[in-house]
Amino acid sequence: MVKMLEEKAHSLVNRLPPWFKQEIPDAKKIQQMKSLFRSSRLYTVCESARCPNMGKCWGQGVATFMILGEICSRACRFCAVKAGRPMEVDPEEPYHVALAVKELNLRYVVITSVARDDLEDEGADQFVKTIQEIRLLMPRTKIEVLIPDFSNKIESLRKVTQAKPEVVSHNIETARRLSPYIRPQADYDRSLQVLENFKKLDPAIFTKSSVMLGLGETEEEVLQTMEDLLKAGCDILTIGQYLAPSNSKRHVRVKQFVSPQEFAFYKETGLNLGFKHVMSGPLVRSSFIAEEGYKECLQKIKL
């Protein structure tokens, strides 16, 4: 009986509120995108992380490429990406990503990856090669990289910095108190150090991070996380609603659904605190409409 009541409560809390409703996406465009990725042997975080915006983004011909395979060396409790023994590094992958960027004629592209603790540089070199290949084929395309923490290895961070992406993103994900439970193989302070070190290595690169709400955090904890990110030199912040990828024991359950009004409050607060750009809403994800954040940062430094 207790188990049945728990399952019922879980079902109720995971019943999506009305503000999650979206327009039906362009099915033909989505199929074209899927065919392109399959033929190029490429992965997208859109699919692997089961992003709720996939239909909208793919319908507009936009996607976030995920390099270094689709199996992560870590098993964060919020993430839908497969965890286990990572795949072999594909030396042709950077070129295939660049070809896809060219075929889609992207003005702005986001490159992310699984964590690769099994590699000496934890995947930094593959990021660099991917940036270089895109620069060769699409020199005007702006590039954002969404990186794992590379265990805060300075040499790995330096490699990526020297490749000159326009934006470097690393997600802190949640408040300090919840971090050990939500992402046990990561570390809250290490994530802050990664962002801070990127700024030290190249102050001209915009840095970015993301926070999920609905994991049991308090308003005070969200505001403290904002303060911590600002102290680390973070320019861009995205805030979205956590949605459990599955009902399995691996994944944390949703504790609460945050209203659009609360998201609006956090956006206003973040801008007042000093972030150059804040995108905050139930469906916001770290790579969602990423170009907008980059453009706003550019405008603000020109003022």
Residue ranges and their predicted role:
Residues 1-64, 95, 99, 105, ...:
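Auxiliary Fe-S-binding modules of radical SAM enzymes
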Residues 45-57, 68-83:
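Local cysteine-cluster metal-coordination motifs and their immediate loop/turn environment
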Residues 75, 119, 178, 247, ...:
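Glycine/Thr-rich phosphate-binding loops of Rossmann-like dinucleotide-binding domains
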Residues 67-68, 145, 170, 280:
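Small/polar loops that bind or transfer phosphate-bearing groups
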Residues 80-96, 103-154, 160-194, 208, ...:
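Core AdoMet radical
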